[in-house]
A protein has these predicted regions:
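Short glycine-/aliphatic-rich beta-strand segments at the starts of folded cytosolic domains
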Residues: 1-15
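Alpha-helical structural elements
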Residues: 4, 31-33, 63
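C-terminal structural segments of small proteins and small subunits
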Residues: 6-10, 23-24, 50-73
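Short amphipathic alpha-helix segments
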Residues: 12-31
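A short linear hydrophobic-aromatic micro-motif
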Residues: 32-38, 71
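Poly-acidic low-complexity segments
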Residues: 38-39, 55
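Short Gly/Ser/Thr- and Asp/Glu-enriched loop/turn motifs at secondary-structure junctions
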Residues: 40-44
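A generic structural motif
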Residues: 45-49
Length: 73
């Protein structure tokens, strides 16, 4: 039985428009059984990713390449 892992990141994503821009990227990175969401009301603009196989560094790199700060907590 595979279980999902929850990854938590501090990001510089601050606006819903930025989340919409990142949606295709995050949907492609996270497998079908996973999910992701931003908490833009949190002071650290938290990104939570629930996935079975995706390494945290893949998320960090993908956001950084697009100009956003991202670090795993």
């Amino acid at each position: 039985m595979n279980t999902n892992t929850v990854l938590v990141f501090k990001t510089s994503v601050t606006h819903p428009q930025q989340v919409r821009q990142l949606r295709p990227l995050l949907d492609a990175l996270v497998d079908r059984r996973g999910q992701w969401n931003f908490d833009l009301e949190d002071c650290d603009n938290i990104l939570r990713v629930e996935t079975q196989r995706l390494p945290a560094m893949a998320i960090v790199s993908a956001l950084q390449v697009r100009g956003f700060a991202c670090e795993e907590l």
